[in-house]
């Protein structure tokens, strides 16, 4: 189980790299997602967006930006 962080250093989720299960906790709510290889999820907290991608059977990658930076990236 590994923690993944946003650009501000806050924990966004925990992921089990072996199984592909991702656990996202926010306040009193817990969401569990199974991610196959080459899939992504977007996690938004206030003005921060983090995209978690399962790149291989045993690894994930994250990209995290301020919401306005993300919108400029999507529109380009």
Which sequence ranges carry the predicted segments?
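Short, solvent-exposed S/T- and G/P-enriched segments that are highly enriched in secreted/extracellular
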Residues: 27-39
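Mixed-charge, Lys/Arg-enriched low-complexity segments
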Residues: 36-76
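N-terminal acidic leader/helix
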Residues: 1-30, 55, 63
